[in-house]
A protein has these predicted regions:
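Bacterial N-terminal signal peptides
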Residues: 1-4
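Tandem repeat scaffolds
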Residues: 11-218
Length: 218
């Protein structure tokens, strides 16, 4: 018998339930499914295995993806406003065009994920693994990358229209060519020395352009 979500009542875990607002699929296996254009607003999706599942153009507002498996999943074009992805595993996931304002990716493992054209304002990535992630044309403001591994990540053409915290972030060969970092906070000179910028890269006050950049010969 299908389970229905009733406002004000706690939904019981039901792995056979249809995608509905507030559904509880915690720790269910939902691999290789086509769930695009669904409505999971407020759903409990913690620990769910969504590997290679299509969640594109889906309402994920205020949903809980903590410790979920999102390997090679697609959330492209979805609305994940105020959602939690804490400790999620999303290697090579597609989050291009996602609206994730106010979301939390604290301690998430999102290596090689695609955040192109994403709205990442007020997003907390503290202690996340984002090596080789792509942030092409992403919108960043009040975004936190503190203690994040951003090695070889790409920030080309980002819209950084507010402060972005890079405190103790690892920026080994991070691509910041042409990026305006003048509003960034927490950056130190030794972090900049590891990154790949160019003569168009704008640094915060007090930091100097290195004599050379590691990726100049590429």
């Amino acid at each position: 018998m299908p389970a229905f979500f009733v406002a004000g009542e706690a939904a019981a875990v039901d792995c056979r339930a249809y995608p509905t607002p507030g559904v509880d699929w915690s720790n269910c296996k939902k691999r290789l499914l086509m769930l695009d254009n669904s409505n999971f607003e407020g759903a409990n999706l913690s620990g769910v295995d969504f590997s290679m599942t299509d969640l594109s153009r889906t309402n994920l507002k205020k949903s809980n993806f903590s410790k979920a498996m999102l390997v090679r999943a697609s959330l492209a074009g979805s609305d994940a406003t105020s959602a939690s992805f804490e400790r999620a595993e999303g290697y090579r996931s597609n989050l291009s065009g996602i609206s994730a304002s106010g979301a939390s990716f604290v301690s998430a493992e999102m290596q090689r994920s695609n955040f192109s054209d994403a709205d990442l304002t007020n997003v907390d990535f503290t202690k996340a693994e984002l090596g080789r992630a792509i942030f092409y044309k992403a919108k960043l403001a009040n975004t936190r990358f503190a203690l994040v591994n951003l090695s070889r990540a790409t920030f080309h053409n980002v819209d950084m229209n507010g402060p972005v915290d890079f405190t103790n972030a690892f920026l080994f060969l991070t691509r910041i060519e042409g990026v305006d970092l003048s509003k960034a906070t927490g950056l130190e000179q030794d972090q900049i020395a590891l990154a790949c910028g160019d003569d168009r890269t704008q640094l915060p006050e007090g930091l100097k352009t290195p004599p050379s950049w590691p990726c100049e010969d590429e």
